[in-house]
């Protein structure tokens, strides 16, 4: 693969995967940069945000960070009146939970973005956008997940046209 990036949420699974990649690059003194795709949902636990900031800053010498702050649609079950909400919605900037991170990529950075787009659709379109931007021949997106947690996660793994790699670790 000539283009590799990790999808990093700031959670345990993607955090372990990202740290394993960083350790491998450093341990083997590889002269490559690893892409990191982080969808910043605005409303996240402070400790998660702090962890994301810390890991990205500490490894900026080997990471190409794509921290996206996009007002895509996100499903919600917290309202009787809305079926979705939008992080980083411009018209609601006065009630944002926190300030947008420095160097965040916004909707202006992505020509494919449209207001009817859901977060999962954005992920898929981002992959194609990055592949084209890097003029890549083969792109690899690494995702650290436990399939027991979500049917959608399981479905993503077993969709066609993907390589599945499992290392034989003694957990």
Stretches with model-predicted labels:
Residues 1-171:
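ATP-dependent adenylation/nucleotidyltransferase module used to activate substrates
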């Amino acid at each position: 693969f000539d283009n590799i990036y990790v999808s990093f949420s700031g959670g345990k699974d993607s955090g372990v995967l990202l740290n394993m990649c960083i350790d491998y690059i450093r341990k083997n003194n590889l002269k490559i940069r690893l892409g990191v795709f982080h969808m910043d949902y605005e409303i996240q636990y402070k400790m998660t945000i702090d962890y994301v900031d810390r890991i990205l800053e500490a490894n900026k010498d080997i990471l190409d960070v794509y921290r996206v702050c996009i007002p895509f649609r996100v499903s919600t079950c917290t309202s009787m009146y809305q079926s979705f909400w939008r992080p980083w919605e411009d018209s609601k900037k006065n009630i944002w939970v926190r300030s947008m991170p420095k160097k965040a990529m916004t909707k202006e950075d992505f020509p494919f973005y449209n207001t009817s787009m859901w977060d999962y659709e954005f992920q898929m379109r981002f992959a194609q956008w990055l592949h084209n931007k890097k003029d890549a021949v083969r792109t690899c997106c690494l995702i650290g997940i436990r399939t027991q947690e979500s049917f959608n996660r399981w479905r993503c793994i077993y969709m066609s046209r993907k390589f599945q790699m499992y290392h034989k670790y003694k957990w």
